[in-house]
């Protein structure tokens, strides 16, 4: 059985990650102290805005899964440790299945594992040495066809003719103000992953209509 999955993340509060911020050094041609401080302030703000992209500075908001011929379901808990424990328990109960994602080998699984470590959550045996086990298929790697070419889920969905509108509100903000819309967005993404996987011949075909 092919199980499609994806995650959404958010940056941790500034006071929790400030000590992890790297020291930014302005280019050597910057001589004016005011310009140097402005440059550093900009880099620091960019770092905070990008906090959700690293397990050092971000956390898991929710995990979406979609089993064949079923609606998407979600692991969502304000307590990240509980969320991770629930997901890994689900994985253990379905470890003979294949988990299909987009960017899952390069981002999703590493993020889940690293956040599990910091939350002291036991991680199943999903590695073969330094590589992931064969349980995971990353459609971004499949798209690469042996090259390092990357793309986004949005671009690939559009490439294959899916109606995929960009978010007008950052997901993290949507999660706070409109949880229902946020979950619908996650459902859209896992269905897009399954549909793209079908086109690529990676995932068994389902009889569903893309809306």
Predicted ranges, named:
Residues 1-114:
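Conserved non-catalytic scaffold segment of RNase H-like nuclease domains
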Residues 58-77, 96-211:
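Metal-dependent phosphoesterase core characteristic of DEDDh/y 3'-5' exonuclease domains
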């Amino acid at each position: 059985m092919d199980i499609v999955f994806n995650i959404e993340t958010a940056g941790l509060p500034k006071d929790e990650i400030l000590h992890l911020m790297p020291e930014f050094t302005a280019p050597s041609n910057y001589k004016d102290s005011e310009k140097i401080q402005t440059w550093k302030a900009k880099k620091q703000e960019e770092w905070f805005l990008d906090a959700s992209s690293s397990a050092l500075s971000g956390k898991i908001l929710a995990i979406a899964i979609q089993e064949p011929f079923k609606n998407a379901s979600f692991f969502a808990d304000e307590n990240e440790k509980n969320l991770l424990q629930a997901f890994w328990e689900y994985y253990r109960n379905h470890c003979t299945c294949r988990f299909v994602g987009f960017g899952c080998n390069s981002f999703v699984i590493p993020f889940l594992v690293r956040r599990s470590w910091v939350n002291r959550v036991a991680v199943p045996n999903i590695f073969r040495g330094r590589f992931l086990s064969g349980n995971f298929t990353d459609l971004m790697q499949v798209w690469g066809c042996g090259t390092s070419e990357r793309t986004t889920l949005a671009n690939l969905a559009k490439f294959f003719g899916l109606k995929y509108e960009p978010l007008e509100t950052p997901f993290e903000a949507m999660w706070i103000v409109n949880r229902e819309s946020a979950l619908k967005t996650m459902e859209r993404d896992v269905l897009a992953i399954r549909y793209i996987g079908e086109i690529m011949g990676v995932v068994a075909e389902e009889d569903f209509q893309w809306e």
